Regions:
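Long, contiguous amphipathic alpha-helices that act as assembly "spine/axial" helices in icosahedral shell
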Residues: 1-13, 36-51, 117, 121-142
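Hydrophobic, aromatic-enriched interface-forming segments
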Residues: 19-62
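Sequence/fold signature of self-assembling virion shell proteins
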Residues: 59-157
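Flexible, active-site-adjacent loop/turn segments at secondary-structure boundaries
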Residues: 1-4, 17, 55, 61, ...
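Alpha-helical scaffold segments that mediate packing/assembly in large oligomeric complexes
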Residues: 1-37, 152-157
Length: 157
């Protein structure tokens, strides 16, 4: 859900392109340059890719990714570092259709927990023990004055 909100609210949405092993590096560098031109800080950037895009990146001779990532970062989903951005691989089923890649700064979007409520029922009828019921409501927002910190590249179908 959060990636969908970020894709819709992105400040940079160039025309869809067919990503190949020959052009993937140039497209990512274009994204980085666009964020640089809008004075987005170079620290705390994240490059979100699908497994298919990650495969193209691995096949590209121009990309040399720093893959010596600590265990703590791997637990968070970071698989590499490219041009100073943490590279995060996300399953295509969790991303919008035709998702190529997204380069974003952490200050451009927030994903708050709006509601978190739990109830415990001690020994309810039919159950021996404690029954816990709960609900959690999440949301996501792209800040209007920070939307230039998101570059979303769609791929051609």
């Amino acid at each position: 859900y959060v990636y969908g909100v970020m894709a819709v609210g992105a400040g940079h949405k160039p025309a869809a392109v067919a990503l190949t092993k020959d052009n993937i590096y140039d497209e990512i560098i274009k994204a980085s340059a666009a964020l640089d031109d809008d004075l987005v800080p170079e620290t705390d950037r994240a490059l979100t890719v699908t497994p298919a895009t990650y495969l193209l990146m691995k096949k590209c001779k121009d990309i040399v990714m720093e893959t010596e990532i600590g265990e703590e970062m791997r637990i968070r989903g970071v698989i590499a570092n490219l041009d100073g951005a943490m590279t995060i691989k996300v399953a295509a089923s969790r991303l919008p259709e035709n998702f190529g890649f997204m380069l974003s700064h952490k200050s451009a979007c927030c994903a708050p927990t709006q509601l978190e409520d739990y109830n415990e029922h001690k020994n309810p009828p039919g159950i021996n023990g404690t029954l816990v019921e709960g609900r959690i409501v999440y949301d996501a927002y792209v800040f209007e004055n920070k939307k230039k910190g998101i570059y979303y590249q769609e791929i051609t179908a």
